[in-house]
Amino acid sequence: MIFATLEHILTHISFSIISIVITIHLVTLLVHEIVGLCDPSEKGMIAAFFCITGLLVTRWIYSRHFPLSDLYESLMFLSWSFSIIHMVPKIWNHKNDLSAITAPSAIFTQGFATSGLSTEMHQSAILVPALQSQWLMMHVSMMLLSYAALLCGSLLSVALLVITFRKNIGIVGKSNHLLIGSFSFDEIHYLNEKRNVLQNTSFLSFRNYHRYQLTQRLDYWSYRVISLGFTFLTIGILSGAVWANEAWGSYWNWDPKETWAFITWTIFAIYLHTRTNRSLQGVNSAIVASMGFLIIWICYFGVNLLGIGLHSYGSFTLTSN
């Protein structure tokens, strides 16, 4: 009873802290003149990280197994993983360009875990025999850490595509405006239009420079976070293969979860390959990473919705790959 109450308190504290952090980010985004709010938001995410850590440890103590055996526990661990990724730039002494992705992701996953699932699904249950293995911690934690990193990296790539396509649409619109002007009005009016555009060149160049810097930072962090996630995913798949051989006598069985994990690994392997080719960097590699965003969610939730395969132990009861 004491552990359950403590878990309940820590859940609501962490959720409230992350909500405040997101509010601070929105305020600083809308009102640039307000300074000094970034540091409290960073401290807030650190506090939320420790609250979720305490929640997982508490659940580990009273359930007597590592809390990764059902959907609720995996979602809380996923939220914890987003909190870790949020602190990565701080460790490397970089500007935190991930906060706009990690904080909403953390609150979304935790919010769904606490409010979107039934109360019965919050209760810890005895592990089924297939999960009673030392590989549970290694395999599932690596997979969920990889999901968190790959989701963040994919969302950064989506943001890069949105900014790039908006820029291209703006350029096409201005070009069409001048082209129409050259045919619809007399030459003097067209020259006046052209002069006005040239007068705004310095302002547009300034905006384009900052847009270029933003896309470069998005590309930089997307590549590094996805590389980290790909490493975790590889370790998770390999450890899962060893566990499968112990449990089922075969390293690979091509059940739905394993198949989609392999598809996920392939998509991000292609992304990393495109990054080695300079001509494919930027938009092309971002498109591949954006496709990976959908693939990850299929891999994470797909088998649980279908309720089939070796990794399925009833609807929404296991997310161990």
Swiss-Prot record:
The chain crosses the membrane at residues 17-37, 43-63, 71-91, 143-163, 225-245, 258-273, 286-306. InterPro entries: Cyt_c_assembly, Cyt_c_biogenesis_CcsA, Cyt_c_biogenesis_CcsA/CcmC. Keywords: Chloroplast, Cytochrome c-type biogenesis, Membrane, Plastid, Thylakoid, Transmembrane, Transmembrane helix. It is a multi-pass membrane protein. The keyword Iron-sulfur does not apply. The keyword NADP does not apply. GO terms for cellular component: chloroplast thylakoid membrane; plasma membrane. GO terms for biological process: cytochrome complex assembly. It is found in: Plastid, Chloroplast thylakoid membrane. Pfam families: Cytochrom_C_asm. One of its GO terms (molecular function) is heme binding. May interact with Ccs1. NCBIfam families: cytochr_II_ccsB. Belongs to the CcmF/CycK/Ccl1/NrfE/CcsA family. Required during biogenesis of c-type cytochromes (cytochrome c6 and cytochrome f) at the step of heme attachment. This is Cytochrome c biogenesis protein CcsA. It comes from Liriodendron tulipifera.
